Structures are given as structure tokens and as C-alpha cells.
């Protein structure tokens, strides 16, 4: 009888210890400060007639963008501060195809050896760019949104709003003309 009492008492004490440990862990995790950085999807808006074959913002890749396209897809994930700080900047790198629809006019059969050789020559005309730009103030963070503008200009925002809505910093027309001289 003493063995049964001792083993059931031991079981109750173990359960009590586990409950106290769990309560302590939950209490400690509830007291942690909020994170200073948040993950943010990356999306892009191409306001030019060129294609943006690939781009990255602060090392996080974004979707490829056809001429005058964007906002339709996101790639995960970049990182943004929970709260905007003065001097916040983004490094944007991208590859641009100035004539994205030229292959449609080629006489070569698509993906043939001749077509692949021509595509290799075409890719030599792609240009690569890098810009460091300021991220304007935002009240609540959102996606990292990159706007590609004529003359190889870019703008980046992490605002919690979208193009066309009040408070969005870059409401450019989707189709912008490239000036003759930049």
C-alpha cells in the first residue's frame, strides 16, 4: 500500500513540476521585447518599356517584371525595421532587357541551336544596375515595394499601403515614357 501511495505521490509531484516549468517558460517568453525587424515580401512595379529580368533589394530577390507590369506577385522575404528611422536606405540591384519582345520576331525556331545562339548574343545587350536609395517615412511597415522608373531610376518604400491609396509615396503612372536624354 505504501508503494502505491509513494508512486502516485511521485507522479503527482512530477506533473506539478512540469506544470510549473511550463508556466515559467510561458511567463518568460511573454516578457520578451518585440522584434525590431520584420520579414516583408518583396514586390516590384516596372514603369518602363524594358523588362526587369531580375532584381534584389538589400539582397532579397524580387519577381521578374515585364514591360509596364508589376504588383501581381511577391517573393519572400526581405527585412524591414518595425519602426522607420531617419537615413533608412535600400540597395537595389537589377538586370534590364531593353527589348524584351525581340525574340518573337526572330525567324529561328524557338529553343533550336540557332535560336539559343541568338539569345546568347541578345543577353549581351542586357544592362546591370545598382542604386542606393532612401526609404521614405512610414507609419506601419508593409511589403518592400520597388518602382523601376525611366532613366534607370528606382524608388523603394516599405509603407503599409499600396499604390493608388492615400499616403502611398509613389503614385506614378504605370506607363511612363523614357525621355530621349536622361
Residue positions per predicted region:
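C-terminal motif of bacterial Sec signal peptides marking the signal peptidase cleavage site
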Residues: 26-30
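Disulfide-rich extracellular modules and peptides
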Residues: 33, 78-79, 153
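Beta-strand-rich cores of mature extracytoplasmic or soluble domains
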Residues: 96-182
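Processing junctions and N-termini across compartments
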Residues: 22-25, 70-71, 145, 176
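Bacterial lipoprotein signal-peptidase II cleavage site
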Residues: 32-39
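Tryptophan-paired
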Residues: 55-101
Amino acid at each position: 500500500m505504501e508503494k502505491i501511495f509513494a508512486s502516485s505521490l511521485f507522479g503527482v509531484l512530477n506533473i506539478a513540476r512540469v506544470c510549473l516549468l511550463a508556466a515559467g517558460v510561458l511567463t518568460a517568453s511573454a516578457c520578451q521585447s518585440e522584434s525590431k525587424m520584420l520579414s516583408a515580401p518583396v514586390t516590384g512595379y516596372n514603369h518602363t518599356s524594358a523588362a526587369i529580368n531580375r532584381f534584389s533589394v538589400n539582397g532579397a530577390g524580387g519577381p521578374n517584371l515585364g514591360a509596364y507590369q508589376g504588383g501581381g506577385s511577391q517573393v519572400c522575404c526581405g527585412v524591414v525595421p518595425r519602426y522607420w528611422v531617419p537615413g533608412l536606405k535600400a540597395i537595389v540591384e537589377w538586370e534590364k532587357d531593353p527589348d524584351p519582345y525581340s525574340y518573337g520576331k526572330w525567324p529561328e525556331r524557338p529553343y533550336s541551336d540557332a535560336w539559343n545562339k541568338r539569345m546568347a548574343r541578345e543577353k549581351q545587350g542586357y544592362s546591370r544596375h545598382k542604386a542606393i536609395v532612401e526609404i521614405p517615412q512610414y507609419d506601419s511597415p508593409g511589403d518592400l515595394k520597388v518602382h523601376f522608373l525611366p532613366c534607370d531610376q528606382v524608388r523603394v518604400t516599405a509603407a503599409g499601403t499600396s499604390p493608388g491609396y492615400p499616403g502611398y509615396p509613389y503614385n506614378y503612372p504605370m506607363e511612363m515614357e523614357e525621355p530621349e536624354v536622361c
